[in-house]
Amino acid sequence: MIEADRLISAEPINEEEILDRAIRPKLLTEYVGQPHVREQMEIFIQAAKQRGDALDHLLIFGPPGLGKTTLANIVANEMGVNLRTTSGPVLEKAGDLAAMLTNLEPHDVLFIDEIHRLSPVVEEVLYPAMEDYQLDIMIGEGPAARSIKLDLPPFTLVGATTRAGSLTSPLRDRFGIVQRLEFYQVADLQHIVSRSANCLGLDLSEEGAHQVARRARGTPRIANRLLRRVRDFAEVRANGVINGEVAMQALDMLNVDAEGFDYMDRKLLLAIIDKFTGGPVGLDNLAAAIGEERETIEDVIEPFLIQQGFIQRTPRGRMATNHAYKHFGMVREE
């Protein structure tokens, strides 16, 4: 199954992006959840503005869909500067990055998503740009080649990644601010769902918002996606009114259970329980058993299951916990 096909995938889907921009918070005062991140960023941004400096370079990491792009937008809005957006895979050559850097205005924010996927040659260009606001460019070829330095305006690099451990140490060490985004609490997600419903003009009850939030895997992007599908159900079956019962009916129809698990989550858990007697099982064997890429299991499916206590990582492989057995009404055989 392709990850983007999953309703509860935390990866963005193209047709959602315009709508997401409409409901995305613009300022820290509108930002819900991540209280430690919000408090720290308020202080760092205010201090930079008082000094008249660019904000220090910021690395944001955590599972997909938790608001890394949203936070980058908020930083630019709070600083009152432009936001330039790109991603690691797009910056194939050093010249691609150089073109973006030379077009920055003072204190602008350059946002690089999937920064762990930068090529080594592009990363080398980034080091002096981040540290000294300088761009080293090679002119000419062969023996006549020479290096010239171009001064860059002070700017803020915001890097986002789901795999902070894949960043090289020299790159990671150049970020003055590092923020980890955690899975959201249900109460915070309920607030986000209610705000999104208000932006979309939906008739959503408090219990309806709660039902959507509790099945959203701690992820705002999934919560907003589920809300849109529940809206479709309500418009056809319930005159557009989304109460708790309508939300539950819609989510049950969508095959998203009370824990927020979909077909792939249940398939993975049942594979460990049934095919590997509860584990431990290596990641490659597990990927082969469910027909999924190991990277998708490791980066997308597994983190929430581990965080919720359904899977345990051990030196010998993945194991299903007693919590997983109870979810399926099973008892672990000793």
From Swiss-Prot:
Binding locations of DNA: 294, 313, 318
GO biological process assignments: DNA recombination; DNA repair
Region (Head domain (RuvB-H)): 258-334
Broad EC category: hydrolase
CC per GO annotation: cytoplasm; Holliday junction resolvase complex
Gene Ontology MF terms in the entry: ATP binding; ATP hydrolysis activity; four-way junction DNA binding; four-way junction helicase activity
Keyword Secreted (UniProt): no
Organism superkingdom: Bacteria
CDD domains attached to this UniProt entry: AAA
Keyword terms, alphabetized: ATP-binding, Cytoplasm, DNA damage, DNA recombination, DNA repair, DNA-binding, Hydrolase, Nucleotide-binding
Record note on domains: Has 3 domains, the large (RuvB-L) and small ATPase (RuvB-S) domains and the C-terminal head (RuvB-H) domain. The head domain binds DNA, while the ATPase domains jointly bind ATP, ADP or are empty depending on the state of the subunit in the translocation cycle. During a single DNA translocation step the structure of each domain remains the same, but their relative positions change.
Subunit structure: Homohexamer. Forms an RuvA(8)-RuvB(12)-Holliday junction (HJ) complex. HJ DNA is sandwiched between 2 RuvA tetramers; dsDNA enters through RuvA and exits via RuvB. An RuvB hexamer assembles on each DNA strand where it exits the tetramer. Each RuvB hexamer is contacted by two RuvA subunits (via domain III) on 2 adjacent RuvB subunits; this complex drives branch migration. In the full resolvosome a probable DNA-RuvA(4)-RuvB(12)-RuvC(2) complex forms which resolves the HJ.
Record's function text: The RuvA-RuvB-RuvC complex processes Holliday junction (HJ) DNA during genetic recombination and DNA repair, while the RuvA-RuvB complex plays an important role in the rescue of blocked DNA replication forks via replication fork reversal (RFR). RuvA specifically binds to HJ cruciform DNA, conferring on it an open structure. The RuvB hexamer acts as an ATP-dependent pump, pulling dsDNA into and through the RuvAB complex. RuvB forms 2 homohexamers on either side of HJ DNA bound by 1 or 2 RuvA tetramers; 4 subunits per hexamer contact DNA at a time.
Protein name: Holliday junction branch migration complex subunit RuvB
Organism: Serratia proteamaculans (strain 568)
Gene that specifies this protein: ruvB
